[in-house]
Amino acid sequence: MKKVLVINSNPKPTEMSFGLRLGEHYLTTLQADADVQIERVNLYEENIPLIDGTVLDAWGKAAAGEALSAEQTSTLGRMNEILEQFIAADVVVFITPMWNLSFPTLLKAYIDNVVIAGRTFKYTAEGPKGLLGGKKVVHIEARGGIYSEGPTTGLRFTDTYLQTIMGFIGITDYENVFVEGMAATPDRAEEILASAKQRAEQSAKNLLAAVK
């Protein structure tokens, strides 16, 4: 059975979000296969530790073999839970909005919990090497403007960063399924979503065919 981990970084209700509606259509297609197990994580409903002074101090103490405080033990334990869940997945689906040319803060916090030296990448004489080859990442993204073509293509920092950081930990099988332009042409928003749903459905079918 293939494990699909879905990371939702949008706080809106599904019906209020083009990205979440697109994501649900994608996941509905996947769920048609009984050999797929889907696990969902809503970053706005979970405890996602930030890398702060407490965490940095805890890492230093752990490396030196020193005792951790109860708070540090709890925080590092939670970070390890997040990491193990990510490592156990065969496919990771990120559902994100583009906010101010980036994505929500909690997604960056989540990524900081799974990009861990010695676990998901390692340092070598030739440079960093990713350790999570063999997985697939699907990035389902909603953008109000047009960023897939024209003069704004270089501003697609959300997608380029996520693809780069996933490649850094060894996941090079990466796909971006996007819906865009709803704010630029609100009168066509539902039409745009319908077209994106067709692409998302085909993407999900391709994934199912590939993992058979």
In which residue ranges do the predicted regions lie?
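Hydrophobic residues at beta-strand termini and immediately following loops
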Residues: V41, I140, V177
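Glycine-rich phosphate/pyrophosphate-binding loop and the adjoining helix
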Residues: E149-K212
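Residues at the starts of beta-strands that form the adenosine-phosphate
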Residues: K3, Q37, K135-V137, D173
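Cofactor-binding loop segments of dinucleotide-utilizing enzymes, especially the Rossmann-like FAD-
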Residues: S9, A142, V179
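N-terminal beta1-alpha1-beta2 submodule of the flavodoxin-like/Rossmannoid cofactor-binding fold
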Residues: M1-T96, L101-T105, A109-D112, I116, ...
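Flexible, glycine-rich phosphate/dinucleotide-binding loops
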Residues: P13, N47, I146, A183-T185
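Short, well-ordered alpha-helix to beta-strand connector turns
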Residues: A89-D90, G134, I171
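Short, glycine-/small-residue-rich phosphate/pyrophosphate-handling segment
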Residues: Y123-F168
